[in-house]
């Protein structure tokens, strides 16, 4: 896909700290004022950019999945993906000012389309039965290393949650897998005036369970409480006829939320909400209580 109008536009490259691992040697940069370019400088990272190009091309086939970025140019020699810039704000920054039900209805519309059987079949024809990839912390790592960040009592709770998550996720999954985005957090969404404009960054997309997709919706930074999660689950069931398991979502969430705290703390990076590991444990305990999940 060629776009000669892009020639000569300045590229603004962001700071690239913390990308010593070849897997992460890719970046997104502004191309002029109206475009965004995705590129990589290692073979490992290039596979993710190429994967996203193929996924977006497949998802744009009618009936297209809503809220996709507009691909302006894509190529493999050199490997590059250019999309049209969409004005707006991360969900993380606006979630407190958006009605939970209104936001959930839009998110469920995107998820219902992405998770459809038709999209899964198209994806398997393009990329094969590739599982979604994201480096979630293992429960073993959380048991062994999280205790250095919190009190003994808090680590006891973390250990119980890990045991519970292992037990829940070991149960046979009764439904076919779907194509999941794989990394659907607030910064991968652009919102404007309470309306979802676009969902970004499909390089982790692959087969998985819908509950895995929603592992970040309980928080942190998704607003107080778990209303966005429960409203999204409700609208998702209305659109798809498929009720999601809140236990499986929260089992994935244990690994997601605590794993994020672990790697940020060990890397010397502030937590996403700029609070402490102990506060993150308290927040997770509150979410579990609000969802009536009692882990002994």
Annotate the PLM regions.
Residues 1-12, 117-182, 241, 279-296:
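An alpha-helical support segment within catalytic cores of ATP-dependent transferases
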Residues 14-133:
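ATP-binding pocket architecture of kinase catalytic cores
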Residues 32, 78, 175-177, 195:
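Conserved catalytic motifs of the protein kinase core domain
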Residues 42, 82-97, 116-119, 139-147, ...:
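A glycine-centered beta->alpha junction motif in the catalytic cores
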Residues 46, 177-179, 185-186, 190-244:
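Active-site Asp-x-Gly
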Residues 76-78, 193-195, 254-257:
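Short strand-connecting beta-turns/loops that link adjacent beta-strands
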Residues 215-296:
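Helix-rich C-terminal or lid/interface subdomains of diverse kinases
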């Amino acid at each position: 896909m060629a776009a000669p109008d892009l020639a000569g536009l300045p590229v603004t490259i962001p700071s690239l700290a913390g990308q010593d691992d070849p897997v992460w040697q890719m970046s997104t940069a502004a191309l002029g004022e109206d475009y965004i370019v995705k590129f990589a400088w290692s073979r490992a990272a290039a596979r993710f950019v190429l994967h996203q190009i193929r996924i977006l091309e497949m998802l744009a086939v009618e009936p297209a999945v809503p809220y996709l970025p507009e691909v302006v140019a894509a190529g493999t020699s050199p490997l590059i993906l250019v999309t049209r810039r969409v004005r707006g704000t991360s969900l993380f920054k606006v979630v407190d000012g958006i009605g939970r039900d209104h936001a959930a209805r839009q998110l469920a519309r995107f998820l219902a389309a992405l998770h459809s059987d038709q999209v899964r079949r198209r994806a398997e024809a393009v990329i094969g039965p590739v599982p979604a990839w994201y480096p979630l912390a293992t429960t073993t790592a959380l048991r062994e290393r999280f205790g250095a960040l919190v009190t003994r009592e808090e680590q006891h709770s973390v250990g119980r949650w890990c045991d519970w998550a292992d037990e829940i996720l070991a149960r046979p999954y009764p439904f076919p897998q779907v194509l999941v985005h794989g990394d659907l957090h607030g910064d991968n969404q652009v919102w404007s005036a309470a309306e979802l404009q676009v969902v970004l960054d499909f390089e982790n997309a692959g087969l998985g369970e819908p509950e895995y997709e929603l592992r970040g919706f309980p928080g942190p930074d998704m607003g107080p409480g778990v209303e966005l999660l429960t409203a999204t689950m409700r609208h998702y069931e209305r659109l798809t006829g498929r009720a999601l398991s809140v236990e499986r979502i929260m089992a994935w969430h244990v690994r997601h939320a605590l794993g994020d705290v672990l790697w940020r703390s060990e890397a010397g990076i502030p937590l996403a909400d700029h609070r402490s590991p102990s506060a993150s444990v308290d927040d997770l305990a509150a979410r579990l209580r609000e969802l009536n999940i009692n882990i002994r």
